[in-house]
Amino acid sequence: QAELAQIPKQGQVIIIANHPLGSLDGIGLLDAILSIRPDAKIVVNELLMHVERLQPFALPVDNMSNQTSRQQLRAIQSHLAIGGALIMFPAGEVSRWRLSGIRDGQWNSSFVRLALRYHAPIVPVLVGGRNSRFFYCLSLVIKPLSTAWLIREMFKHRNARISAHIGSPITY
C-alpha cells in the first residue's frame, strides 16, 4: 500500500509492468491503481473487451496480429492528453519460458514515445508470480494453445495474493 504513493495522484502517468500471470496480474494491478487514480485505464488485448466489468477501464489493442487501429491508438493518446493514468504491459503478452528463465518477451518501446510526447512520468512495477510448469511446457510446444490455457491458470491463482513492487517515477 505504501508503494502506491510512488504513483502521482494527478496528471498523466504511464505505469508499466512485467506480465508474469496474464490477465490476473493486469486485473490486480488495475484494482490497486484505481484505489488512488480513479481515472486509470489499462491497455488490454481486444479479446478482453468481452469482459463487461473491465470495459470502462480498458483501452483495447490488437496485439495478436499487430493490427492496432488508428482509433485504438487515438484512445490511448487521448487518455494521456487529458491527464489520465495509463497501465501498460510492454511485452504485450504473458511471460514465457526462455533460455534465461521465465521472462517477458521483448518490450515494445511505444510507452517511451508516449511518455516523451505527453510529458508523462513512467512508473515501473515489478509483478511477482508464476504460472504452472505445464503452461510453460505447453507454450514451448503450442503457443496458441498455451494462451487459451491461461484461463485455467487464472483460476488456479484466484485466491492468491499477487506481489507487486512499485518503483519511483522516471521523468523525461
Regions from the PLM with identified roles:
Residues Q1, D62-Q67, S100-G101:
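Short, flexible loop segments at the rims of nucleotide/cofactor-binding pockets, characterized by
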Residues Q1-V13:
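A short, well-structured juxtamembrane/interface segment
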Residues V13-Q67:
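Catalytic core of membrane glycerolipid acyltransferases/transacylases, capturing the structured
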Residues H19-S23, V94-S95, R130:
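Gly/Ser/Thr-rich loops at beta-strand to alpha-helix junctions
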Residues A32, S78, R113-A115:
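Hydrophobic/aromatic ligand-binding patch that stacks against planar heteroaromatic rings
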Residues S65-Q72, R103-S109:
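Active-site glycine-rich loop that binds ribose-phosphate moieties when present
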Residues H79-E93:
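A structural motif
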Residues A85, W97-Y172:
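A cross-family acyltransferase "interaction/gating" segment
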